[in-house]
Regions:
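Surface-exposed, charge/polar-rich loops and edge strands
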Residues: 1-342
């Protein structure tokens, strides 16, 4: 298939600049595969569309406040580092701006100078290996003090509270972007879901900035996905296998949870406790075998995410549903309304 097959026209005003308040006040489009119907609801009504015995699988990755504004030593020139992944110890792979002026040996100070960094080397793609020094026990304490959330480029409004870009169940630090389908859940909603006999399991997939990288190839099969680290615990693997054995549904919350489970299934032919890196790319023609339902947001035109949705729900039905979403003025992208394919 071609990239242009996944294009749709989206009015700019439908790109959400802030999350719903409260979180579960977001709208919910329910795509009923059995009856081939589109239903319009609100996210706090999600429990009504779940069944006793269902299992929701959420991604518990936590977003790092990984965007650091600093000054070069001794010139005082303003610069920016965006932490992408931990290489080893206090050395991280970073995106640097202005990259050409931050060569090996460049020293940077942040805040009151209690956090510093030295550029070690420049990688072939222009990213940098950077080693940090600080006066606290961990770097994460300094990131909480000086760092900002690395919001997607299409969100131009500053957040009032950085927790707005974290799920309420986030615990494993490591993502450069939020697993956004989970932003709709509140603790109260999760309690209601559990009270209906629905279980909730956790996986971890640390979302990389590659999630925003556009597909540049005309033929989507030629696209090379970025690599991301994931982990599935023994407890989660057991819950998934017990749910399937009992004939109940495994429902992925978000494309990251979906990609985690499908990666494990593709490698082992079943769900097992494991961790590793995945660059799985799911698009029409690839059968999803690990999930029975998917809760997700409304994604960018021509993105790998809308291609994944098309693989699960069907290309024609997906594009038709997106057309309806635009007509009904649903909100799109990271702070968007939600879709439940059941």
């Amino acid at each position: 298939m071609l990239k242009k097959d996944f294009w749709y026209d989206l009015p700019k005003e439908l790109i959400a600049q802030e999350p719903a308040d409260p979180r579960d006040a977001a709208r919910l489009m329910v795509l009923d595969r059995k009856n081939d119907k589109i239903l319009h609801s609100v996210f706090h009504e999600l429990p009504h569309y779940l069944e006793k015995g269902d299992l929701l699988v959420v991604n518990n990755s936590k977003v790092l406040p990984a965007r650091l504004m600093g000054t070069k030593v001794p010139t005082g020139a303003v610069c920016e580092l965006l932490l992408l992944r931990q290489v080893k110890g206090d050395t991280w792979e970073c995106l640097a701006r202005p990259g050409k002026r931050m060569q090996a040996g460049t020293k940077v100070e942040f805040g009151d100078g209690s956090l510093t960094a030295v550029v070690d080397e420049t990688l072939p793609d222009g990213n940098k290996y950077v080693t940090f020094s600080y006066d606290t026990e961990t770097l994460y304490e300094k990131l909480d003090e000086f760092g900002k959330m690395p919001l997607p480029p299409y969100i131009t409004k500053q957040l009032e509270d950085q927790s707005q870009y974290q799920t309420v169940y986030a615990k494993e630090l490591g993502s450069a972007a939020a697993p956004t389908a989970g932003l709709h859940f509140t603790p109260q909603l999760m309690d209601t879901i559990r009270s209906r006999g629905v279980k909730i399991a956790e996986v971890t997939l640390h979302v990389g900035l590659g999630t925003f990288r556009p597909v540049n190839e005309e033929s989507i099969e030629d696209h090379q996905m970025h690599s991301e680290w994931y982990s599935v615990s023994e407890e989660t693997a057991n819950l998934i296998n017990e749910t399937r054995a009992a004939g109940h549904r495994v429902i992925a919350v978000g494309t990251t949870s979906c990609r985690t489970l499908e990666s494990v299934w593709a490698k082992y032919g079943k769900i097992v406790p494991c961790s590793g890196n995945t660059s799985i790319f799911i698009y029409p023609g690839i059968e999803l075998k690990a999930i029975d339902g998917l809760i997700t947001n409304f994604h960018l035109p021509e993105s790998t995410l809308i291609m994944l949705i098309s693989a699960f729900y069907g290309y024609d039905k997906t594009m038709a549903a997106y057309k309806v979403a635009v007509e009904e003025k649903y909100r799109f992208f990271s702070f968007s309304d939600a879709m439940f394919i059941r």
